[in-house]
Amino acid sequence: MSKYSDAKELAGLTLGKKTEYANQYDASLLQPVPRSLNRDDLELGDSLPFLGHDIWTLYELSWLNSKGLPQVAVGEVYIPATSANLIESKSFKLYLNSYNQTRFATWEEVTERLTQDLSACAGEAVLVEVNPVNHYTNQPIVTMEGECIDDQDIEITSYDFNAALLEGAAGDEQVEEILHSHLLKSNCLITNQPDWGSVEIRYQGAKLDREKLLRYLVSFREHNEFHEQCVERIFTDLMKYCQPTKLTVFARYTRRGGLDINPYRSTEQDKPAHNNRMARQ
């Protein structure tokens, strides 16, 4: 369990509790989670060591137009890593469901309402795109860049999170490379439900021992944290134990409740070059 799973800030969340589904617009359904909960544990101060965003894809976004005809769209939301709060995912789902039987005059009105509400919950301006389904007709299914480190003939007997598995992972050779793994799995901080993801690590610096890196990533398998928190933990652990001069950690998680979350943290830029989905998304 996480060190802060019993924090008072989490006590009022609807996550893990039986809830009613509203179908009329209700911004009060959104619930923030202070980023400081895990950042204090990681000993991160006000000056963050990374840039980044949490990129959400909204696959179940629907409302009624002014004549009552249902509209459907796919939303993309970019929440800055500098925001005071992340947005709890079940509350996000319930909030989106509240649009289902609500009339809006234009698509622009929906975008503006989403932007206003999500920014208020996050505590910082959020970027929202609302796109018609055919916007994605020719979008490719992609994989992560670089080399996959998963095909290693190693034995693993422990699945308890252990950052010290990265000790000695930095070699003597200086490289610039991209590695990825599809074996990232952690558990929801509140419900203990599994969260499945892939993670891409782009870095410049001492060459990483791929066996040590894979063992470290697998150690998240029984770890309880939200997606965004896991990615920040990976970033800070790599910085601590391996000290690269450049580092980007980008995870893409499978969707739940019509939402997927793709946290991006980097020393170089605040967003990835694209937001194309992967096979498991």
UniProtKB/Swiss-Prot annotation:
Keyword presence, Zinc: no
Residues that, per the record, bind substrate: 87-89, 227-228
Compartments where found: Cytoplasm
Single GO term (MF): preQ1 synthase activity
One of the GO BP terms on file: tRNA modification
Coiled coil: none
Disulfide partners: none
Gene3D superfamilies in the cross-refs: 3.30.1130.10
Pfam families: QueF (PF14489), QueF_N (PF14819)
Ligand binding (NADPH): 89-90, 256-257
GO cellular component: cytoplasm
Region called Disordered, residue ranges: 261-281
Keywords noted in UniProt: Cytoplasm, NADP, Oxidoreductase, Queuosine biosynthesis
The family this protein is said to belong to: Belongs to the GTP cyclohydrolase I family. QueF type 2 subfamily.
Name assigned to this protein: NADPH-dependent 7-cyano-7-deazaguanine reductase
Organism of this sequence: Vibrio campbellii (strain ATCC BAA-1116)
